[in-house]
């Protein structure tokens, strides 16, 4: 479980060797050794990234905490589980008011209903292509390119996914005004319009 959750089996040495062909990426590999991409539950990842839209980290943590406290199950030893899509699908948007998630409430409910109802079958998508997963996720209200890419990467463990937000776009544009280095070939970057 720990191996799959923390991508420990990925060849970090091989990845760093490939990326070290570029000075910026070589510096990143040497300054942040051993950094890993956390693989999380698909539903929890999808819902968390819907909540993250136009939000800051303390607020995101608060909303997710309230979501778990209000709709999750109490865990032995303290804390609450992340509520299932099925549990949230039975609710209305107004039921999520205690979360203080604003416009995201209706997106959470739509995602829960589509997942619980099987329109977006997260289990089946584990064996689907990246594009099939992406297309399915984009059926959910409030899920755009960034949320879909984040879910692909952190929920489905698809390491070719490349979530782009304003900060990533800005850094990539500053460091690579003429495009990415060859060592990044194969990384899906069609979302970057520098």
Residue spans for each PLM region:
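HhH-family (HhH-GPD) DNA N-glycosylase catalytic core used in base-excision repair
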Residues: 2-192
